[in-house]
Amino acid sequence: MRQPGRRPALDFDDLIYGIHAVEEALLAGERLRSIAIAADRTKDAALRILLAQAKERNVPVRFEQRAFFDRVPFKAHQGVIATAPPFPYASLSDVLARPRRDGSPRMLVVLDHLTDPHNVGAIVRTAEAAGADGLVLPERRSAGINAMVRKAAAGAAAYLPIVRVANIAGTIRALKKAGIWVVGADASPAGIELGKADLNRPLALVVGSEGSGLAPLVKRECDFLVRIPMLGRVASCLLYTSRCV
């Protein structure tokens, strides 16, 4: 039932939209505040699991007219929008303290100031699928985990520990002190061909920004570089790395 009274303003960064993203957030145990579903989807079989999970977790569900969904800037919402608390970032120390389930070498992904939420979301999705222990991104000049990133990640942001740090170069130094080899993904000839790199070790893969790639200081901090021609090949690198470790 819709509660009477004035409708609160929406904080778009704290929304999760799309059937799959909301469903995965529920399955992962995220404490969603409420879920809005388009009134014309009340009998949609595709929502059966989502509604059952919401009921089990006591998440309020309300059915809204399409005018409600017109208020948000996201067009791919599929008539499903959840309101969530601010994204629960992990700490780097917690991520490093967690044992690998299968005993294989640790694997992290570090993003050096990527600003496109669709690229960040795609890397979150691939990193989670490849079995990464976590993903690190900077607090400034970078896309954080917002509604668009969650949608592009197709639910993976609910499962992959994600850390925000003040300084990427400093974080790389901390990772190396923790015994992790830091590998920069780079398009320059200076990099080792991906298939020839020894990646069977505790590893952090650093991915540079869409326009300028790895920052010079970040590149210098890396133990070595692997040659990747373009950002779209990051998925291949992550999947290759997961097979190596």
Positions of the model-derived regions?
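Conserved small/polar residues in nucleotide/adenosyl-binding loops
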Residues: Y240-V245
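Short amphipathic alpha-helix with an adjacent loop that forms part of the alpha/beta core around
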Residues: V95-R100, G195-D198
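Short beta->alpha connector loops at strand-helix junctions that form conserved
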Residues: Q65, P85, D112, P138-E139, ...
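Active-site/ligand-binding-proximal alpha/beta "capping" segment
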Residues: V183-A235
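N-terminal positively charged helical leader segments and presequences
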Residues: M1-R98
